[in-house]
Structure formats: C-alpha cells, structure tokens
C-alpha cells in the first residue's frame, strides 16, 4: 500500500554547533531515572527536568510540552538543575567502568565540561546560588565541590573527609553545607573554613535522604520503613511502615509528602505535617488514585510548590497536585507515544528501506511516499539483496531470513550456531561473526554454510576484491595482530602489519579496507581511521583522534567515508571524510544521538538512537529534515 507522506511540522529549537532539540509529548523510551525541578518555588511558572535510562534529558514546561535532547548513550542516574534553570548537571553510568559527571548548558545544548570517576557518584546537587556542584562519591574522601563555571574541584572547600555522601545541600548564603552519609552521620560544614561544625549520629543506611522544614528534619527510607529524624538531637521521632515510597520534599517544605504504591496499581499520596518544629503528625492521606503497575509503575518524582511530577518504569510522565481529594481517581500520563521506532535502514535504488518492530517500509526524502512492503517477522536488522531483503537480529540465534516482498515469501537461510554479533553481504556470500569467536560464510545460491575462521577477541570481518576474508580482532589474542587475512579456499591465515591494540568497524571497496584501530602508548589512547590496501599490503592513516571510541563505526559511500569518531565534545556527531581531498563535513545532529549512516546517489540519511532519521544532501552539514514514523505509517517532520 502506497501512502503519500503527511508531514506535520513541529516546533524545534536550533542552537550553537547546529544542535537542536525537539518539543513534543513523547515519553522516555526507557525508565525515568530521576525528576528534578527546573524552577524555583517562587517562580510563576513550573518546570521540571526528567532524565532516563535512554540518555535523554527532557525539560517539561507548564503546558506539558517536553523539550527533548539526548546527551548520553548511557543511563542518566542523577541530575540537578542550576538555580537559574540554565545549566543541568548529570551523572552518566553504564553501571560499571563508565562514571561520568557533566555539565550541560541547556540554552545552547552544549556540554561545558565533563569529569570521569573510578567509583560511582552517590549524590548530585547545586549549591544554593549555583556557584558549585556538590558531587558525592563512593570513596572515603567523599564529596567534592566543583566550580560550575570551570569544572575544577575547589580544593580545600571541605578539608575533612566526608566519607560516602548520598545527600548534600547548602544554606542560602552558601556558607554552610549539610550532608548525610549512609554510615549514619548528618554533618554540617562551615564552607568558609572547610571544617565540620557539627556531626550528629543518625539512622544508618537511609535511601532517598532529604532535609525539610529548613534543616530541622531529616527523612529517609530503609527496609520499607520511613524514618524522620530531628536534626538538633539526632533522635528518630517517627518510623512508619510503608510500601514502595517515593519521598517528595525539599529543604524549604514545612511538611513531608510521600507517595505509596501497593504494587497493585493503587497509589496513595500521604503527608507528615510539621506540628511544632519538633515533631510531625501521623500520616495523613491527601489523595488516592489508580495508576500504572508492574513494569510500568511509577518510580520517581519531584514536588514543586503544590505540583508533583512523576516518572515511570516505562518512560511515561505524569502530573498531579498535592490538593486534598477524598475521591478515588485514575491518572493518565501527560506523555503520548505516537512514533514507530525505526530499527534499521538500507539503501535500495533511489529509495531506502526502513524496518520497524512490526513492518518493513520503503520511502525517500524526495518523493515523500511511504510504501509498506509487509510484516516484520520479529527481526531488528536488514540487508538489501537484489529486490529482496535479508532480515536478522543482533545478539540472538534467531534464523536468518530472506524476505521476497514481491510474492510475498519468507525463506529461512540458516540458523546461527551461537549469538550473532554481525552479518555482512558480499555478492552472494553472507559472512557472520558469532560470539566474537567464529566467522562463518553462507553461500546464498548454493545454500551452503561453513566455518571460515575461529579464534578469540574477534571484532568484525569483510571480504575484499582478492576474495580473501579479513578479520579485525584484538591484538592480545593469537595470532598477535589486529587484522588478519584468511584464504577462503585453503584456510591459510596471514597476519597483516596493521598497528593497534584492536581493530573494528570495517568497510571495504575493492582492495581497500577501511576501519578503526585503537592504540595505547604510555597510558594514552589514540584512535585512528585507517586504509589497508590488500594488494600493496600497506596501511595509510586517514584520520587520527585522541581518546578511545569503542562504539565507532565506518560506512563507505565513495568518495566519502562516514564515521562517528572525533566527535565534537559532548555532541556525538557523524562526519564524512572525503577520501580524495581529506576534507571533512561534520553533520549537525538531531535531538537524538546518531548510530548509523546510509547513502544513495541523492541523499545521506542518519538513523538516530530514538528511532528517528535525519536527512542530508551529503555535501552540507545542515539537516534537511528530521523525520519520525508514526504508528499509522506517516512521517512527522521536525
């Protein structure tokens, strides 16, 4: 079925370095990790920032419109907004080796600075006037005061080791800081001297620790129990059994609000009322409502004045008020998921294929026609093969399929033996890499599958014009090389002289193999884009960059080589290197980070992490359009 494209133009904001955000009611694609106010309680309008596992920051305004911008390929575990609302500090992590703290200027959508940590960041906040960012770390030294303007640590701001800190805040003059340590300490520091003024022993192991009523009370959760501590004495003045609570308070709130979830979709907003600045009341029910449950349950929230914004495990965002209401109501998200995420794409003549979860489409920028070719039988990647399509799924053992949509007919080619890492097509030969240890070749015409090479630390593989298989690998595994040649007839393997600790991201044109190599020398890592000529057996450096880019790729559409390394700081852009004159075009990015490029004679198209695409003419850095495919098979243009 052909469908003329209906392009609805939405608002967009363009900033420095060509960055642009998208304004919509689209939710996060994964769980909302944190919600934080982006305005002061005294401000006339209310604004919030939500951050998610999808690496997106979304600034929500009072009209429930969200300004979307993806800053990381990792989860954003914590976020804080500067008092003036301009800067957003974020903690990004992969849950292991990557622990990065960065400051973003929301007006220009640019990263001002970034810092890396060996250990996790346990708390993140701005000082009252925004002069410093307080970062708690999972080390004995504990909290750091980082100058907002420069990203430098203010050495000596705290002279006493704080230990692990999970909550930190300052007073209005920024002369006093209060910090809670899960070890069971609530400490007050004189920031003019850097010394502790007072240290109070309190309940250990509290999560969601927060001060309220102007530093008089400390609240936190432990083992499904809500505790409130009187800060002057350190005495626990109340403990309340609760279910999946989310604390909703700030240091200026007189009362403590918290949201309970019974796990069956019933939520109760409760309040502990400040009685006499020494005690709090028993829990008072403010309102009850039915909401999402299971893997869509509400998991985060923030209160600003009388308004509360909530985030869920599915990425949806909700908004309620703290007004008392005795009626049982139901809440609906302010977000609406209207897009069909594009999983993969490939050129076909003057058009491109686009694969979504349920369908295969064919379309182009110039004609504006969307044609649905058929159902997607549960695959995530595609390869153009004549007038047919090869469908497969990365990191699975799902059968590799040949889809002839003109019939339509789906044929199983073969089933991978282990988890499929990559699949490439060279003429009638499919070359796969399974579990980073085995390379197999499948002859489509003969229906024959055979193992061509096995080893360890394998990264990528291509077949060059000499009909040999070239395997990129780790230098640390035998044979000791980063790229080796395999004779597909005899099985003979010959190491090449390509330098580097590891090679990956290969592309090939006749006898020239292009790829990415990483080399470490004296603790410094450098990433190179290389060209290896199989006939001359010589390597030429195409481009060199400082640092390591483990997710780098190359895509060749001669004379341009597309790659995502050498990115503008924090911008995650794609560049096209002209292989004849070495000139570079750095493409302005969309609201989402780019992950793949594809080209035909007329257009270049980039696939973004959120499933949108960005169109370019291939000769200019300017975005022609950002398109999202709706669930009705129509294009939305930003």
Where are these regions (language model features)?
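Eukaryotic protein-protein interaction scaffolds centered on beta-propeller repeats
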Residues: 6, 20-35, 47, 55, ...
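A short beta-strand motif characteristic of beta-propeller blades
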Residues: 21-25, 65-70, 110-115, 153-159, ...
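Short loop/turn segments that connect beta-strands within beta-propeller blades
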Residues: 61-64, 105-109, 148-151, 190-194, ...
């Amino acid at each position: 079925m052909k469908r003329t494209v209906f392009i609805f133009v939405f608002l967009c904001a363009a900033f420095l370095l060509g960055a642009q955000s998208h304004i919509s009611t689209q939710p996060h694609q994964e769980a909302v990790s944190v919600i934080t106010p982006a305005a002061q309680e005294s401000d006339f309008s209310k604004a919030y920032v939500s951050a998610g596992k999808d690496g997106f920051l979304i600034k929500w305004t009072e009209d429930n419109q969200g300004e979307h911008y993806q800053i990381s390929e990792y989860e954003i575990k914590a976020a804080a907004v500067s008092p003036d609302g301009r800067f957003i500090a974020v903690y990004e992590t992969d849950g292991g080796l990557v622990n990065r703290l960065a400051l973003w200027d929301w007006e220009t959508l640019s990263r001002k600075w970034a810092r890396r940590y060996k250990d996790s960041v346990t708390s993140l906040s701005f000082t009252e006037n925004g002069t410093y960012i307080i970062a708690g770390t999972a080390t004995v030294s504990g909290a750091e005061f980082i100058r907002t303007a420069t990203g430098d640590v203010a050495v000596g701001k705290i002279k006493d080791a704080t230990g692990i800190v999970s909550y930190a805040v300052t007073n209005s003059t920024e002369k006093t800081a209060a910090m809670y340590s899960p070890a069971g300490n609530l400490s007050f520091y004189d920031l003019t001297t850097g010394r502790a003024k007072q240290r109070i022993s309190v309940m250990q192991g509290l999560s969601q620790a927060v001060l309220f009523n102007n530093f008089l009370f400390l609240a936190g959760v432990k083992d499904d129990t809500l505790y409130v501590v009187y800060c002057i004495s350190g005495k626990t003045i109340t403990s309340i059994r609760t279910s999946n609570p989310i604390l909703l308070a700030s240091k200026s709130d007189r009362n403590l609000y918290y949201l309970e979830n019974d796990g069956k979709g019933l939520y109760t907003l409760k309040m502990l009322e400040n009685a006499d600045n020494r005690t709090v009341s028993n829990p008072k029910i403010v309102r009850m409502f039915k909401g999402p449950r299971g893997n869509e349950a509400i998991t985060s929230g923030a209160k600003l004045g009388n308004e509360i914004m909530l985030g869920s495990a599915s990425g949806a965002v909700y908004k309620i008020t703290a007004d008392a209401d005795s009626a049982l109501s139901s809440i609906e998200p302010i977000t609406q998921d209207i897009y069909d995420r594009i999983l993969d794409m490939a050129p076909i003549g003057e058009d491109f294929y686009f694969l979504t979860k349920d369908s295969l489409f064919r379309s182009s920028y110039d004609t504006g026609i969307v044609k649905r070719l058929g159902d997607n039988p549960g695959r995530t990647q595609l390869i153009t093969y004549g007038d047919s399509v090869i469908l497969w799924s990365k990191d699975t053992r799902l059968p590799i399929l040949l889809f002839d949509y003109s019939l339509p007919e789906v044929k199983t080619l073969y089933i991978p033996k282990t988890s499929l890492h990559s699949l490439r097509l060279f003429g009638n030969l499919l070359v796969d890499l399974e579990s980073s240890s085995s390379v197999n070749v499948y002859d489509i015409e003969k229906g024959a599958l055979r193992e061509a090479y096995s080893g360890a630390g394998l990264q990528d593989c291509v077949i060059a014009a000499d009909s040999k298989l070239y395997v990129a690998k780790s230098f640390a595994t035998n044979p000791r090389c980063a790229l080796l040649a395999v004779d597909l007839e005899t099985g003979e393997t010959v190491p090449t002289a390509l330098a580097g600790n590891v090679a990956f991201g290969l592309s090939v044109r006749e006898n020239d193999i292009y790829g990415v190599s990483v080399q470490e020398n004296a603790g410094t890592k450098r990433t190179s884009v290389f060209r290896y000529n199989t006939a001359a057996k010589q390597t030429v450096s195409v481009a060199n960059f400082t640092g390591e880019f483990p997710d780098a790729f190359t895509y060749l559409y001669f004379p341009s080589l597309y790659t995502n390394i050498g990115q503008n700081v924090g911008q995650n852009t794609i560049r096209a290197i002209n292989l004849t004159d070495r000139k570079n075009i750095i493409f302005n990015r969309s609201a989402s980070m780019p992950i793949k490029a594809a080209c035909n004679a007329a257009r270049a198209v980039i696939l973004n992490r959120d499933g949108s695409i960005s169109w370019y003419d291939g000769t200019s850095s300017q975005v022609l359009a950002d398109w999202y495919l709706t669930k009705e098979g129509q294009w939305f243009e930003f």
